[in-house]
């Protein structure tokens, strides 16, 4: 097998994501006929420091959300630069893409154009070598199946209801294998549907497959989930814990946190009190974006108060960016980073962020976006880096289920080598 295999063509197209908006799909062709394909996701609640997702802005097409400019950038500018390069040199190709763009936020070519190429290159290389993507990226030590962080009640910008908090999730930490954990999550999901029906609530779903009922309060979301866990025959606080994504940048206004549906306007300290009260009352193991992306002082306070007993995940805070993560580590802020490929724009930069987090004792949670496709790259990525946690929606809607099904296949392929760490995935929390 050759150690230098040339890229001979790169083709991008506009396809649809799960929210019926266009996104970029890229195919990379190699000299021996091998092809790699990848599709790029898109977020609903986006951090202001994320790499730029290039949209056309033509209101006559797809409400201005078209990606024909990004597609043209791949088919013309990027293709010209990377045709002839060695597909097996991912780091060099990603460096070439970054330099070709020349901006610090990928605003010229678009992170959606660059990421599509970066991921398609990796897939083409794995296909050429005849190995699974997780093994190509992670090598022989890639063997940890993740604890799912399943979003089963949607609120905030992921739903049209009376809940301020964006996501309420279940984490099956009390099981000894991935497949058993997924089964338990599916059973809780069905139990939750019955529970909501019995209370007269809607069981329509949000962007990520979770239910979006018009609950009376944010706390009621947790309470109906705990009821569903018990109805499914499991024990909250033992087999299942709760994770929330507060997405608090969405309701941070003029230095205050405005919980519209609660009728409350809170200071940073009061917001920390709010979460601390929940942590003391409910089996919560993870809080994502509990403070706004600009509220470093609030984050510091929250970390001091809750950082030993709860995973505090920075999403909008860190945006998968090593510079922002480095600042957070130096200031002792948060203890975990959410990893979203399209926030930074290349596979290499994503791997660098995960490595930096691990060195600092932070956990890394590999994540989907609300606008997804059938692409399963993140399922392979989470195993490749042994991250131990994945956030990819409810066990419903095929663009979410595709990731879980890929993980089931990987689990089967790894066989006895596969590890499922459960509660031990939270290695930096006190037991």
Swiss-Prot record:
The active site is at 208 (proton donor), 340 (proton acceptor). Its main location: cytoplasm. Pfam families: Enolase_C (PF00113), Enolase_N (PF03952). Binds a second Mg(2+) ion via substrate during catalysis. The keyword Lipoprotein does not apply. CDD domains: enolase. This is Enolase. It comes from Clostridium perfringens (strain 13 / Type A). The gene is eno.
């Amino acid at each position: 097998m050759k150690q230098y295999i040339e890229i001979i063509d790169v083709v991008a197209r506009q396809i649809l994501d799960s929210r019926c908006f266009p996104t970029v799909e890229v195919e990379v062709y190699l000299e021996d006929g091998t092809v790699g394909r990848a599709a790029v996701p898109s977020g609903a609640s986006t951090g202001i420091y994320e790499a730029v997702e290039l949209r056309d802005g033509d209101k006559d097409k797809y409400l201005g959300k078209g990606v024909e400019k990004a597609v043209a950038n791949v088919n013309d500018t990027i293709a010209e630069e990377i045709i002839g390069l060695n597909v097996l040199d991912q780091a060099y190709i990603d460096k070439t893409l970054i330099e070709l763009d020349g901006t610090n936020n990928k605003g010229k070519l678009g992170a959606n154009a660059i990421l599509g190429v970066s991921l398609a290159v990796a897939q083409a290389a794995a296909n050429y070598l005849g190995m699974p993507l997780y093994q190509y990226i992670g090598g022989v030590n890639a063997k940890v199946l993740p604890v799912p962080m399943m979003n089963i009640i949607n609120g905030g910008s992921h739903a049209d209801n009376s809940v301020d908090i964006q996501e309420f999730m279940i984490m099956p930490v009390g099981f000894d294998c991935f497949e058993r954990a997924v089964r338990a999550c599916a059973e809780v999901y069905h139990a939750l549907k019955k529970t909501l029906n019995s209370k007269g609530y809607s069981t329509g779903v949000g962007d990520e497959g979770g239910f979006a009922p018009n609950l009376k309060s944010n706390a009621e979301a947790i309470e109906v989930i705990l009821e569903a866990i018990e109805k499914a025959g499991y024990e909250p606080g033992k087999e299942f814990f709760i994770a929330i994504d507060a997405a608090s940048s969405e309701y941070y206004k003029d230095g205050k946190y405005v919980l519209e549906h609660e009728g409350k306007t809170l200071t940073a300290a009061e917001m920390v009190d709010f979460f601390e009260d929940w942590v003391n009352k409910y089996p919560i193991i993870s809080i994502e974006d509990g403070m706004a992306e600009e509220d470093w002082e609030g984050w510091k306070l929250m970390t001091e108060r809750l950082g030993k007993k709860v995973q505090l995940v920075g999403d909008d805070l860190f945006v998968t960016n090593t510079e922002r993560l480095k600042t957070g580590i130096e200031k002792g802020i948060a203890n975990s980073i959410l990893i979203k490929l399209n926030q930074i724009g290349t596979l290499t930069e994503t791997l660098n962020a995960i490595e930096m987090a691990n060195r600092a004792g932070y956990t890394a949670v590999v994540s989907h976006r609300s606008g997804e496709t059938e692409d399963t790259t993140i399922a392979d990525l989470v195993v490749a880096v042994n991250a131990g946690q994945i956030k990819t929606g409810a066990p419903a809607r095929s663009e979410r289920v595709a990731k879980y099904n890929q993980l089931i296949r990987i689990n089967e392929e790894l066989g006895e080598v596969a590890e499922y760490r459960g509660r031990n995935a939270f290695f930096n929390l006190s037991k």
